[in-house]
């Protein structure tokens, strides 16, 4: 089970829903790190709020995401599927309300979108590096 799915993680998400300044402060700090350069960042908001960087969206079907989460967390497919559906809905609503972002559907800010369903982590990394080399970023 990942931290986000624990009681503490869920409580943290609830705080974010009612206190947008919490996320905005995290974003300010994240942008400072991005501006320093030479970093790899995983962020839901950075592709929309940062003008710099090579931005990648990792896409996956609900079925494959469910399988991967069930294997990683050793819980049932049904429980994983329900958690993913709730998390996706809550993320969409949160980022729409706080940022006007259509999270999960608007992929315009991304330099690359990869469907990871039939790829290993190594294949995903290799595809990203290849694209970065093609574009002259690497």
Regions from the language model: what does each represent?
Residues 1-50, 75:
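ATP-dependent small-molecule kinase phosphotransfer cores
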Residues 44-47, 61, 119:
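Short glycine-rich anion-binding loops that position phosphate/pyrophosphate groups of nucleotides
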Residues 46-53, 105-108:
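Short loop/helix-cap segments at secondary-structure boundaries that form the rim of catalytic
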């Amino acid at each position: 089970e990942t931290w986000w799915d624990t009681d503490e993680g869920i409580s943290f998400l609830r705080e974010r829903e009612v206190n947008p300044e919490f996320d905005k402060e995290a974003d300010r700090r994240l942008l400072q790190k991005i501006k320093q350069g030479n970093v790899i960042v995983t962020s839901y908001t950075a592709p929309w709020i940062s003008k710099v960087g090579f931005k990648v969206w990792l896409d996956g079907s609900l079925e494959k995401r469910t399988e991967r989460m069930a294997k990683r967390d050793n819980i049932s497919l049904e429980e994983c599927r329900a958690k993913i559906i709730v998390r996706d809905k809550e993320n969409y609503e949160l980022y729409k309300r706080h940022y006007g972002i259509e999270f999960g559907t608007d992929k315009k800010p991304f330099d690359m979108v990869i469907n990871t369903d039939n790829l290993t982590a190594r294949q995903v990394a290799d595809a990203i590096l290849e694209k970065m080399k093609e574009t002259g970023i690497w």
